[in-house]
Structure formats: C-alpha cells, structure tokens
C-alpha cells in the first residue's frame, strides 16, 4: 500500500523555516526550502508589449529596449546574491550578464528573443 500525506502547510518541527528531506536512495539530506525555485517566468520578447505567458512570484515585466528586460519579483529576495538562470529561443543568445537587486532582475539578450525563460534560486526575504 502506498503512503499518502495530505497537508496544506509544512513547518519544521525544531526550526519553522527549515525542513530536511532525505535524498533518493541514500541517507544524504537536503534542505527543502533551498531547493525550491523562488520565481520563474516565460515571456515573448518579440511582442511589441512583452507580457508573461506564465509566471510564478513575478509581478510585472518592463521592456527597456532591444534585448533588455526587467522582471519584478512579487515576494522579494533576501539579498541581491541569488542565482539566476536565463535562456531564450529564436536566434538571440542570452548574455551571461544579469543585474540582480532584491526585488527585480534585468536580463539581457543579443536581440529581442522569441520566448525567454528566467528562474531564480536563493533565499526569500
């Protein structure tokens, strides 16, 4: 028989903001909160007014000109040292440059991309 756990909220027993999960097949543990994606978006940068096609924890999107976009994060990050991952389709390679601040990130492409995808990992405020 398969076990099933149904809950609406998880909270650490000894530390409310920390839950350890045993990795698959071993006794190694990882922190659940650290492993979650904190923000992600998908948008079409070639649209005259780019908008999210889908997103999580992202409020608005600003087009600052050819190949330069700013994603605003709904629930701010704890600092500006979070990790970002950006990629795109079409023929516009993504720059490795991203300007991160607590509540948003500016991303750069070689040109206006077709679809652009962006993810954030790190600590929320």
PLM region descriptions:
Residues 3-4, 11-77, 104-125:
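Extracellular receptor-binding modules and their adjoining Ser/Thr/Gly/Asp/Asn-rich linkers
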Residues 78-98:
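Terminal beta-strand-rich extracellular "head" domains
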């Amino acid at each position: 028989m398969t076990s099933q756990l149904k809950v609406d909220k998880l909270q650490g027993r000894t530390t409310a903001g920390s839950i350890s999960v045993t990795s698959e097949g071993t006794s190694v543990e990882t922190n659940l909160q650290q492993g979650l994606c904190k923000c992600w978006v998908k948008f079409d940068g070639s649209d005259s007014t780019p908008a999210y096609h889908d997103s999580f924890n992202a409020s608005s999107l600003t087009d600052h000109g050819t190949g330069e976009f700013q994603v605003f994060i709904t629930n701010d990050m704890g600092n500006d040292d979070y990790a970002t991952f950006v990629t795109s389709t079409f023929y516009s390679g993504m720059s490795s440059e991203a300007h991160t601040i607590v509540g948003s990130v500016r991303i750069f492409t070689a040109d206006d991309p077709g679809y652009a995808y962006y993810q954030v990992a790190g600590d929320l405020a």
